[in-house]
Amino acid sequence: MGQLLPKYNILTEDQVQKIHENTMKILEEIGIEFEYEPALEVFRREGQKVEGKRVYLTREFVESKLKSAPAEFTLHARNPENNVVIGGDNIVFMPGYGAPFIYELDGSRRKTTLQDYENFAKLAGASKNMHLSGGTMAEPQDIPDGVRHLQMLYSSIKNSDKCFMGSAEGKERAEDSVEIAAILFGGKDVIKEKPVLVSLINSLTPLKYDERMLGALMAYAEAGQAVIIASLVMAGSTGPASLAGTLSLQNAEVLAGISLAQSINPGTPVIYGSTSALSDMRSGSLSIGSPECALFISASAQLARFYGVPSRSGGGLNDSKTVDAQAGYESMMTLMAANLTGVNFVLHTAGILQYFMAMSYEKFIMDDEIAGMLLHYMKGYTFDEDGMAFDVIEKVGPGGHFLTQKHTRKNHKREFYTPTLSDRSAYDTWAKEKLETKQRAHARWQQILANYVPPALDPEIDAKLQAFIAQRGKEVGEE
């Protein structure tokens, strides 16, 4: 959706320039290691200094590559009504990503299954606030690793007609994702002209990219598909114990990845990604439910605008191990930071617990409510004739009320947010059952799944997808 409220810039122009200059110095004097010979060959071809696996990128090279990256692009869904524009004034929400565990209502934790993935794909498909339906929402531990990405992709396609993410687990799995997308949309030539996949490419901080991520990045760039180039620097452990230094380190890694993508295929849709946070000095754990993480979210959105590319950051981020007040207030802080500062692509919007390690059905429903509230908040005020409401104010006059006015019946659904989870009833009504938020969320996700009907998928395309997945299973020895 388009964002109507003005974006908040947390950094001054001078501070942005200081980060940029520090970043250029890192890239030129320290360099980045790329553990993948095809990537090193690209940089050699581009005239950049390569010593072993370390690449030194000049300011002129990086700045020229940024110019070829689109400021915004459309990601296409199999249902065109669900296409999303990434960049500009738009904000796109999608569920959590990469979690190997599920937290149950009773607080217990278990490994994720393919059924969990399918359930989250359906919940995302049913949500009016989630714009994408899947990536690696809940990585199924009951599926062999070699075919896990295939089953997740198929589940995303089968259970929703929204946009979805491709696998970033190396060159072959990225190519599998492209092949599946080509089957779904009618050929590789078709999807090269209109991107249908977005994938998450993470640096290996500090100042490295590994073979797995580089292989995926290059495969997607060659196919014309979108890539999020992301860095997760943990201030105090994988990054310096200063926020500006950590931001500079993150910026260097992201710009290096963007430069590679643009060198392979100029115009490749890229998204500037950040999940940088800190390492808690007491436990050593990653802390994403922290004010420092919210600061990185805010600054990353501003840096992306400075470089003229879309941004990815934020989400319902928290460090809690259960669906409690901590999960709520930390998630609201990081989601609000993303909204107010103009982040375009918000991964991990719904369901995440324990610093990316787990998903929760109840948390998904609670985060979906937060997302709905924030989308409404970002619409701001309406200033047309109905919005100004002079006529009805004049009609009611001093001491009257507006409940029975036609203006109220006409405008309240447009102007007011109606919650799907929050309880606004009178105390006596609430006291009959005294349900806590997570108990209401538990009932709601079960109701959604019971009533959800996945959108139809063309039987011929479905058969081709299943045949490809079966063939790939044989080839990797995991039928």
Curated annotation (Swiss-Prot):
Q: Name one GO molecular function term.
A: methyltransferase activity
Entry keywords, A to Z: Methyltransferase, One-carbon metabolism, Transferase
Which reaction is the catalytic activity of this chain? Co(I)-[glycine betaine-specific corrinoid protein] + glycine betaine + H(+) = methyl-Co(III)-[glycine betaine-specific corrinoid protein] + N,N-dimethylglycine
Q: What is its EC number?
A: 2.1.1.376
Q: Name one GO biological process term.
A: methylation
* Broadest EC class assigned to this enzyme: transferase
**Matching InterPro entries, A to Z?**
MttB-like_sf, MTTB_MeTrfase
Q: Please state, per the UniProt record, what induces or represses the expression of this protein.
A: Highly up-regulated during growth on glycine betaine.
Q: Name one Pfam family in it.
A: MTTB
Entry's family note? Belongs to the trimethylamine methyltransferase family.
What this protein is reported to do is described as: Methyltransferase able to methylate free cob(I)alamin in vitro, using glycine betaine as the methyl donor, yealding methylcobalamin (methylCbl) and dimethylglycine. In vivo, probably carries out the methylation of a corrinoid protein, likely the adjacently encoded DSY3155, with glycine betaine, to then supply methyl groups to tetrahydrofolate (THF) for ultimate conversion to carbon dioxide; oxidation of the methyl group would also provide reducing equivalents for anaerobic respiration.
What else does UniProt say about it? In contrast to a small clade of this large protein family whose members have trimethylamine:corrinoid methyltransferase activity and have a genetically encoded pyrrolysine residue essential for catalysis, MtgB lacks pyrrolysine and uses a quaternary amine as substrate.
The protein depicted here goes by the name Glycine betaine methyltransferase
